[in-house]
């Protein structure tokens, strides 16, 4: 007798190259057995006609806020993650996130969380620990040793790695970047980087961070390449990455299957002259939209855009500027990992935070037929788990963590839009986290089963 049994489902496990009608037995939060044999459980799920997959892993998202005074989380993005089949996510990306990562992880274990969560040490938290620095200026050499000690302490506390957001903090120069990256490398932990710039500066920005990785021997993950290099640069950039990988450098990249990016209006992304990087004229200001909320629907020209930016730097902007073919080229590359870059703020957001993984399957597998189902599932399970070193995630092997997503292939579809970014997807039937049912028939029934993921 098992605590939980999933019966009659079509098990798809890329890590073991399994695709067959099998039963799954679960005990003590772990997968006990995957077999054709009949099994019985205290709780049973009949998965007839459904796909049984390792739980989806999102290795690039932005975690919910944590209030230290009330010792509570404001679950927004994490609930959306659960509803689209995510069982484990990695926050702290792009160099931004919680100022005290280990304290945040401790709260996850103490209070519970909708999904399992790991954190990178965001660069801004390292800088913030030593003062409120000008983001456009380099840090004085005097602070570097202390910053390295702060990073080491967070890594010792179980953080997955380091993240840098060079575009958001353009004052980051070689010394600061490489000194911190060397600490991550010595700890055998990943470094994720949001590169310095995009558009016609993509190639030089990619070469900059690859050089940093080469000099420090860091494992480099280039963040959301799909939104940084889809302006006529994707083929060249991927060629550069592949060539360095062939030389032995540990380089990976990820992307999301949407043709518009989203970030804060006050960030350096929208500094004066940004459209010139994309070889776009002023008419493209009309392709920039407030994500959602009371200010949604404002139509921009150059003058109104910069006036609005000065008044509302925290507004999230949807930039409908990406080349569809290049996004697809990124997402379908054999080594690409698919991520959401999910971010919600003040009721604003991009639909990727609620729809990325169902969209990948519905659009790329079912509609466009440019990915096989096995390849799509691998990009959101085994590949991210392997990339960040989570051996008990992303697989249905016996002994692995019982994190499982069950979905209907004929129904799975992203429903979130730019007007309704929080709308849950269709077709996600069950989500199992640490051996217990967190979501049933598309509805959350327990949102505290997740625990911290540490390395």
Region annotations inferred by a language model:
Residues 9, 328-335, 340-341, 404-453:
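C-terminal cap of metal-dependent C-N hydrolases
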Residues 9, 29, 49, 60, ...:
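Divalent metal-coordination and catalytic microenvironments
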Residues 129, 135-141, 147-160, 164-167, ...:
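Active-site neighborhoods of metal-dependent hydrolases
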Residues 55-66, 166, 191-198:
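Histidine-centered catalytic micro-motifs
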Residues 29, 385, 391-415:
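Structural signature of the urease/amidohydrolase superfamily beta/alpha-barrel
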Residues 61, 69-163, 249, 258:
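Divalent-metal coordination cores built from histidine and acidic residues
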Residues 1-40, 411-418:
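N-terminal metal-binding scaffold of metallo-dependent hydrolase/deaminase domains
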């Amino acid at each position: 007798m098992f605590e939980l049994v999933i019966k009659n489902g079509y098990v798809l496990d890329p890590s073991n190259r399994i695709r067959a009608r099998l039963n799954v037995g679960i005990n003590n939060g772990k997968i006990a057995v995957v077999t054709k044999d009949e099994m019985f459980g205290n709780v049973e799920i009949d998965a007839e006609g459904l796909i049984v997959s390792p739980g989806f892993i999102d290795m690039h998202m932005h975690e919910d806020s944590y209030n230290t005074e009330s010792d509570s989380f404001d679950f927004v993005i994490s609930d959306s993650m659960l509803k689209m089949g995510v069982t484990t996510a990695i926050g702290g990306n792009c160099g931004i996130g919680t100022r005290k990562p280990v304290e945040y992880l401790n709260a996850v274990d103490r209070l519970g969380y909708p999904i399992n969560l790991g954190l990178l040490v965001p660069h801004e938290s390292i800088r913030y620990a030593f003062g409120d620095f000008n983001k456009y200026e380099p840090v004085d050499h005097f602070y570097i040793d202390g910053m390295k000690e702060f990073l080491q302490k967070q890594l010792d506390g179980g953080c997955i790695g380091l993240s840098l957001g060079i575009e958001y903090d353009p004052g980051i120069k070689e010394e600061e970047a490489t000194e911190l990256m060397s600490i991550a490398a010595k700890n055998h932990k990943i470094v994720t980087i949001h590169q310095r710039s995009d558009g016609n500066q993509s190639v030089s920005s990619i070469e900059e961070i690859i050089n940093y990785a080469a000099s420090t021997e860091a494992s480099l993950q280039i963040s959301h390449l799909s939104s940084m290099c889809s302006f006529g640069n994707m083929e060249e950039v991927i060629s550069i990455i592949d060539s360095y990988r062939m030389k032995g450098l540990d380089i990976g990249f990820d992307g999301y299957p949407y043709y518009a990016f989203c970030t804060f209006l006050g960030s350096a992304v929208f500094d004066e002259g940004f459209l010139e990087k994309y070889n776009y004229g002023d008419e493209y200001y009309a392709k920039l939209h407030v994500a959602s909320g009371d200010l949604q629907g404002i139509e921009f020209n150059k003058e109104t855009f910069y006036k609005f930016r000065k008044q509302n730097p925290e507004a999230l902007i949807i930039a409908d500027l990406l080349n569809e073919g290049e996004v697809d080229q990124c997402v379908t590359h054999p080594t690409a990992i698919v991520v959401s870059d999910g971010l919600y703020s003040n009721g604003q957001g991009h639909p990727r935070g609620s729809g990325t993984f169902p969209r990948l399957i519905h659009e790329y597998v079912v509609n466009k037929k440019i990915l096989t189902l096995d390849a799509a599932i691998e990009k959101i399970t085994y590949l991210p788990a392997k990339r960040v070193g989570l051996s008990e995630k992303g697989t249905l092997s016996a002994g692995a963590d019982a994190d499982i997503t069950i979905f209907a292939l004929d129904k799975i579809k992203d429903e979130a839009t730019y007007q309704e970014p929080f709308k849950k997807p269709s077709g996600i039937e069950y989500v199992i986290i640490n051996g217990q049912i967190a979501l049933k028939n598309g509805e959350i029934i327990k949102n505290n089963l997740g625990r911290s993921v540490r390395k």
